[in-house]
């Protein structure tokens, strides 16, 4: 079940930008490399922040310091991912836009971004937000778990796009 129909994909695939992407041998592998490097930077930063929230790594550092270290990487890598992903879609519109797994990836991406924004916002409002009481600590553990699951789901769904319809 795709939200975008084949006629749109045919039109998009026939645009001059799509034609250049499709016919220049090095563009798609370069875009894929950029996309993979950006997701590696974003994913590792998000996971390390989440693991700190769990208390698994860097327990001796305040959470605000961990956030200061990793959130800039996340917010730098995200637009790189979105731009490289958009060009990959333009280059191969049917591969993504007619694939249900692509829409699963987009839903997981939206969830992951919202959770990450919520985690960052809570710390900017109060640096000790997740450490104030047991209820907040449990909520932080839950948010970190959702974050890890959502970002992992983005990775997995992104990889599966090549192998599903």
Task: Label the predicted regions.
Residues 1-165:
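Polytopic transmembrane helical bundles with strong interfacial aromatic enrichment
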